[in-house]
Amino acid sequence: MLRAAGNLSKSMMKSQRRFLNLQEFQSKEILEKHGCSVQNFVVASNRKEAEEKWMSFGDHEYVVKAQILAGGRGKGKFINGTKGIGGVFITKEKDAALEAIDEMIGKRLVTKQTTSEGVRVDKVMIAEGVDIKRETYLAVLMDRESNGPVVVASPDGGMDIEAVAEKTPERIFKTPIDIQMGMTEGQSLKIAKDLQFEGKLIGVAAQEIKRLYDLFIAVDATQVEINPLVETADGRVFCVDAKMNFDDSAAYRQKEIFAYETFEEHDPREVDAHQFNLNYIGMDGNIACLVNGAGLAMATMDLIKLHGGEPANFLDVGGAVTEDAVFNAVRIITSDPRVKCVLINIFGGIVNCATIANGVVSAVNKIGLNVPMVVRLEGTNVDAAKQIMKKSGLKILTANNLDEAAAKAVSSLPK
């Protein structure tokens, strides 16, 4: 569940579902609209716009943040950057903040969640600094184990929650919420105490927690993550950094939120894949992967790396895949010029292996394939699928298990 709290953009049960992700400033706009406490902030596309908008700020600290969807901005690096700053810059000097804006806008930011090519920064958010006394972590998310919303809270905020879970799991508190009853006053007070708020701030924090939960329900979110939720030196509670995800199934009744959606940051192949209900994420390697199931896809990538290779992508075709979707999956993964081998790994439960085979053969015949292809098929109609492959006359390397498939894919790469 904590992995989900860190990144809910992974997927799907019965069919492919994509989650809408928002940039931080968009999440803060939603928080503000729903009565949650956020510090003053503005969004700008250039230095002049920033100066005009932040005139209302006091002479306090300025926090300049590059607005991209990827996490890890603070430790990120700009390609061709000259100032040595990352995607988050904090200063008390207005001139230094303006220089940081110049450094960020128009450059590509590389973080642990982007490819080596990075993501172009077109907007920055400038927030008014607050005097932080203490940082906590709070997330509301949909949890399969609980069949409903769960609040994940920790008094150790401002850091990677997965690191907290690994090193000090006793510092993480989970509170399931009955989606019919909603969050009770007792639950919000307990969570505030779990976060180690004291005195009158227990009530203040409890109200903020309740507002965040109500927001989560009102906007059909799959995740509302506040890291950090802070206590200030003058006794206030603020949502300083926010991340939200929304289920596409809610788009018809959340038109205002889904109007935020943009594909500018996405890999064109990712946008292309979405049209065919394919879950595609580009990576930096040269072995393209076509797999059914997110777990099997990740295991496939792990074994590729274990054998010394690097995956070029994550691609889950899902359980309801058609021949046309398989055709387009092959087309999309082979459109990456870095790809030197294709690995297809299918375990057919719901998926019909013959459907996969027909789609692959059709794609190779129409598109052509100039790199080795390794195929491992098991499950429903596997014998028919193997016959389809055999009769096609295509030069396809077969494997009996995943480990063998990964090893063959890596060994087939040009030396």
Curated annotation (Swiss-Prot):
Binds 1 Mg(2+) ion per subunit. Pathway: Carbohydrate metabolism; tricarboxylic acid cycle; succinate from succinyl-CoA (ligase route): step 1/1. SUPFAM superfamilies: Glutathione synthetase ATP-binding domain-like (SSF56059), Succinyl-CoA synthetase domains (SSF52210). Its EC number is 6.2.1.4. Its cofactor is Mg(2+). It is found in: Mitochondrion. Transmembrane segments: none annotated. The record marks 61, 131 as: Important for substrate specificity. InterPro entries: ATP-grasp_succ-CoA_synth-type, ATP_grasp_subdomain_1, Succ-CoA_synthase_bsu_CS, SUCC_ACL_C, Succ_CoA_betaG_euk, Succ_CoA_ligase-like_bsu, Succinyl-CoA_synth-like. Residues 28-258 form the ATP-grasp domain. GO terms for cellular component: mitochondrion; succinate-CoA ligase complex. Belongs to the succinate/malate CoA ligase beta subunit family. GTP-specific subunit beta subfamily. GTP-specific succinyl-CoA synthetase functions in the citric acid cycle (TCA), coupling the hydrolysis of succinyl-CoA to the synthesis of GTP and thus represents the only step of substrate-level phosphorylation in the TCA. The beta subunit provides nucleotide specificity of the enzyme and binds the substrate succinate, while the binding sites for coenzyme A and phosphate are found in the alpha subunit. This is Succinate--CoA ligase [GDP-forming] subunit beta, mitochondrial. It comes from Caenorhabditis elegans. The lineage of its organism: Eukaryota, Metazoa, Ecdysozoa, Nematoda, Chromadorea.
